Every structure is written in structure tokens, then in C-alpha cells.
A protein has these predicted regions:
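N-terminal membrane-targeting hydrophobic helices
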Residues: 1-120
Length: 120
């Protein structure tokens, strides 16, 4: 898949996540912009770590293990995002990590739909 497709998928996932999160807590520009930057970075990070110069570029950063790690990371950070802000000392950082994991996760899910899929 091309970088542009990964970016569009990641940004769409981010807008859905930000929309759902806005029902629980107030989202301001102070957290929206870093979250958008984090999801853009996460959406292209697997291809930065493993440059797609050959047909064998899918290694550990494009694997099912990486997918499981990102599901866990997103799940934990997103769940803590639903707690009231005073309970989380670095709420914007946790939100940024969850957005990065969301972008990475959707990159891997998009790659999983291709013919080659994801390696073990």
C-alpha cells in the first residue's frame, strides 16, 4: 500500500476516535493537534522502520506480533483516556501515545488486507 493511503486511513481513524472521545471529555486544540501529528507519524512509522525497497520489506515491524503490541498499547492508553483528567498526570502524553498506536495499528490492518498480508 502507498504512503498516501496509509495517511488517509490513519487520519480517518483519528477523526472517529476524537469524535468518540469528545463525548467523554472535552477535546481542545491543545490535545487535538498533537494527537493528529501522532497519528500521522504512527501511520507511516512501519514504513520508516522497514523501508519498502523490496518485496521482502515486511519484517518484525510489519508482523502480527507488532499488531498485537499495538492493539494492547492502544487499548491500555485509550482506556486510561476515559478516566477523569485529574487522575492522569500526563493526559496529553497518554492521548498522544494512543493516537500514535492507533495510526500504527491501522497501518498494519491496511497491510493485512493486501495479498501478502502480515507475516507471523
Amino acid at each position: 500500500m502507498r504512503k498516501g493511503a496509509h495517511l488517509i486511513i490513519g487520519i480517518l481513524a483519528f477523526f472517529c476516535y476524537a469524535y468518540l472521545l469528545s463525548f467523554i471529555q472535552e477535546t481542545t486544540g491543545a490535545s487535538f493537534v498533537p494527537g493528529l501529528f501522532a497519528v500521522i507519524t504512527g501511520s507511516i512509522m512501519p514504513d520508516i522502520l522497514e523501508v519498502p525497497t523490496s518485496w521482502r520489506h515486511r519484517g518484525i515491524f510489519h508482523s502480527r506480533r507488532a499488531l498485537k503490541c499495538m492493539v494492547g498499547t492502544f487499548g491500555i492508553t485509550a482506556a486510561t483516556g476515559f478516566l477523569p483528567s485529574p487522575l492522569i498526570p500526563h493526559a496529553v502524553l497518554v492521548y498522544g501515545i494512543s493516537c500514535f498506536a492507533l495510526g500504527y495499528l491501522f497501518h498494519l490492518l491496511a497491510d493485512a488486507t493486501t495479498k501478502r498480508g502480515l507475516p507471523e
